[in-house]
């Protein structure tokens, strides 16, 4: 099983921003190879927001990439602020979405000071919160943007979790090999290790200061009965993790199963999913023996099916 890596990345030292500075072809494949998000997921967010008397005027789609979910948000909100740390991603978003009902910003979510205080009804962060090195600072910036009673909606999903334990084992080793390749070119390896640990398992992000967010925020773990998000962190680098646990003492933790997030891939679909990760565009030979293991498992009758694990965090801004 060969994987076409037509967009090789330079072996120079890279920042977090450079890792996900990808061209339009990457984002097209990203939409195909990542979960097709069911509408019930968005409806749960909208219902939470409405249930806490939230307005549907302005939403900030932070860390939006090239606006993967911005059009969906525009179907409910009058105005969507689309922001990303990568200028090229924002340019692609503006080109694809147009400007009616949208505005565009380039910058880190913890540094977008030009967004007026208490001017946003919802801050929506999908698959991006783990990139903020200073989680506390990022949450202060998000809280500052939100109107009293506004909603912070954050989710992490993307890496598949396969039903067959043998397939899942190989997928974990593929992911960890990708993590090794990314760490070889990371300009701040410890920071990149912490990004990896935030983005795996139960998605360890978003410390919720109860002076800024009401108690009993929701942390909902979907389809995580056998494990959370498959991570990139190589086991030999776990001793370098410095990230604290961000679950709060009063956060409401629930585990649920949702069949709408199930998938069933063939080998081409597996390849397409792999190519949604930045390490796919590195050294192809580093994965050769792992592809052979997957092919052999499929020949033996293993199915490439399972469910996407999802973490959803919902919190309400205090009135202070």
From Swiss-Prot:
InterPro entries named in the record: Diverse_substrate_MTase (IPR051052), Methyltransf_11 (IPR013216), SAM-dependent_MTases_sf (IPR029063)
Source superkingdom: Eukaryota
Entry's Gene Ontology molecular function annotations: S-adenosylmethionine-dependent methyltransferase activity
Pfam families xref list: Methyltransf_11
Keywords on record: Methyltransferase, S-adenosyl-L-methionine, Transferase
Record region (Disordered): 231-252
Keyword S-adenosyl-L-methionine: yes
Endoplasmic reticulum in keyword set: no
Chain intervals with Basic and acidic residues compositional bias: 235-252
GO terms under biological process: methylation
Pathway: Secondary metabolite biosynthesis
Residue ranges of the region described as Methyltransferase domain: 61-154
Documented EC number(s): 2.1.1.-
Known function: Methyltransferase; part of the gene cluster that mediates the biosynthesis of geodin, an intermediate in the biosynthesis of other natural products. The pathway begins with the synthesis of atrochrysone thioester by the polyketide synthase (PKS) gedC. The atrochrysone carboxyl ACP thioesterase gedB then breaks the thioester bond and releases the atrochrysone carboxylic acid from gedC. The atrochrysone carboxylic acid is then converted to atrochrysone which is further transformed into emodinanthrone.
Similarity comment text for this entry: Belongs to the methyltransferase superfamily.
Protein name stated in the entry: Methyltransferase gedG
């Amino acid at each position: 099983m060969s994987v076409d890596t037509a967009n090789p990345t330079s072996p120079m030292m890279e920042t977090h921003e450079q890792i996900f500075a990808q061209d339009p072809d990457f984002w097209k494949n990203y939409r195909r190879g990542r979960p097709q998000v069911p509408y019930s997921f968005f409806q749960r967010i909208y219902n939470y927001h409405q249930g806490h008397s939230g307005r549907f005027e302005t939403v900030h789609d932070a860390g939006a990439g090239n606006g993967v979910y911005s059009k969906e948000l525009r179907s409910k909100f009058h105005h969507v602020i689309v922001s990303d740390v990568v200028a090229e991603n924002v340019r692609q978003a503006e080109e694809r979405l147009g400007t009616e009902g949208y505005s565009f910003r380039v910058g880190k979510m913890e540094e977008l000071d030009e967004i007026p205080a208490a001017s946003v009804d919802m801050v929506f962060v999908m698959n991006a919160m783990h990139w903020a090195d200073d989680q506390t600072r990022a949450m202060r910036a998000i809280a500052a943007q939100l109107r009293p009673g506004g909603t912070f909606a954050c989710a992490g999903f993307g890496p598949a979790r396969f039903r067959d334990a043998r397939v899942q084992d190989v997928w974990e080793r593929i992911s960890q090999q990708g993590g090794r390749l990314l760490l070889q070119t990371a300009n701040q390896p410890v920071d990149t290790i912490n990004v990896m640990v935030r983005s795996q398992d139960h998605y360890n992000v978003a410390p919720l200061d109860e002076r800024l967010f009401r108690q009993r925020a929701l942390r909902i773990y979907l389809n995580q009965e056998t494990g959370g998000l498959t991570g990139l962190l190589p086991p030999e680098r776990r001793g370098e993790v410095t990230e604290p646990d961000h679950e709060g003492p009063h956060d409401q933790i629930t585990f649920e199963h949702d069949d709408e997030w199930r998938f069933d891939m063939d080998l081409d679909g597996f390849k397409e999913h792999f190519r949604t990760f930045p390490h796919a565009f590195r050294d192809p030979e580093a994965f050769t023996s792992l592809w052979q293991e997957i092919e052999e498992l499929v020949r033996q009758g293993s199915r490439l099916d399972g469910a996407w694990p999802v973490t959803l965090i919902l919190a309400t801004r205090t009135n202070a």
